[in-house]
């Protein structure tokens, strides 16, 4: 029995910005008591233990022995002890009249014994990962959304972190089984990859994501925010909007912990900055140098500010990593007097998905993404793929084009693609990669990825589409030239890799070509780039935004499309070489998500 429930109390400060709390709700009280009864890793949230190195949460307790003092430091302290206060100030070039007393070697040894707070302790796994980049998949667990949501109390407010890079594939609709969409706060992260500035993100990005989430799922537009945890976009507004007792949930590598670090840093910056006389003197000298200098280097100033920010984020808040499954338990934070809980990420199938085929350095590179506002626009560079050629990015997928067709491809994934003449050629090269050293850098995966290769058909489309690969990014695909037949694009995916198609995202988040001249007259497609005006298209929810891929069950792709759609709609639907797609029926064969 928990006994009588006491009023709301905060206690047991472990580190700046992090605490454990006692709540009035019995369920929340039980969760909070667990947080306080056991020491947890301040980086991943797992319960700490120092008995079995092979079990999760192992850590080495701080040593009780005095810290080793270098002979040079000991000599320095001894000499400083013999100086007067005035001589000490002169030696240190300081005008501070209230200099602290020098620390001797013996004093330093005494004060450094057992100074590490319990809340600052990290498990061995986190230290190995952060300081040595040593990772083990066994220590990077990924849970299902059902298991993660079962750890959140019924009265906990859910804040859903959604990755903008692979949207809407990053939005797991199973969460609506646990909370009404109108009660969820949505934070769309990594928007710095879509927009060059926070102003454009707020102007165009926020409009689209609010439209989509409200019209498709019934979310409250006032609870939808666009942000970037890397460069702290809109964090002040988010802090004001976040309800107390919030639980940050989202897919693996969606950026939950990065957002929390950004929130903590924003709170730190908002605090009054009271300088000591020594700090004030140092600041005045810096200002004098900047005023008297002929050329003030703004880049150096910005760089120094970024270093301060990075140091703070490395010191405070949860641990972050490009490896999936880094957070392993609840980590509670105090942000502006509100309880914010970092929760482990989830996956649809409790697997590492595409990450399982990659090594840590490759994951780090791919996770950086690319600037879509540079690489994915209507006037961005493209490459053409045609006549049965197969495009691959590291062997993570194989996109096969039909004969007698040409496609323009814009790559918004942080790795170069390679084009093979056929699927058979691509497979044979990977299977004998030891004999093809010149093509080693083409593949990011090994030959075992071919063991369970799955074939999917891309639903018929009219105009451009985005092919979205989960946790990677997307390719923008535009068919060109005269169409001979209706053979579709085919994609081969290793087991666990997820993909969908969607309408081009840039259509809704940037001003794109309207297909009309300044007088409103329609233009031929070849004249669009030279004479078309631009416009911003709003998502109205009347057309499908995205579609699942169609599983291939035979060699006749057209028949597979017909049979799958007929079964899905419970009515006969035919797709063959006589089918004509245009604006009126271009989404007829899409499989709504």
UniProtKB/Swiss-Prot annotation:
Cellular component, GO annotation: mitochondrion
Where does the UniProt entry say this protein principally localizes?
A: mitochondrion
Q: Where is the transit peptide?
A: 1-61
> Which cysteines does the record link by disulfide bonds?
none
Q: Which GO terms describe its molecular function?
A: GTP binding
Keyword Transit peptide attached: yes
For this protein, the record's SUPFAM superfamilies field holds: P-loop containing nucleoside triphosphate hydrolases
* PROSITE patterns attached to this UniProt entry: G_CP
Domain named CP-type G: which ranges?
142-349
Superkingdom per UniProt:
Eukaryota
Subcellular localization, as worded in the UniProt entry: Mitochondrion
> Which Gene3D superfamilies does the UniProt record give?
P-loop containing nucleotide triphosphate hydrolases
Look up keyword Transit peptide and say if it applies.
Answer: yes
Q: Enumerate the UniProt keywords alphabetically.
A: Mitochondrion, Transit peptide
Family affiliation: Belongs to the TRAFAC class YlqF/YawG GTPase family. GEP3 subfamily.
Record function comment: May be involved in the mitochondrial lipid metabolism.
What is this protein's record name? Genetic interactor of prohibitins 3, mitochondrial
Its taxonomic placement starts with: Eukaryota, Fungi, Dikarya, Ascomycota, Saccharomycotina
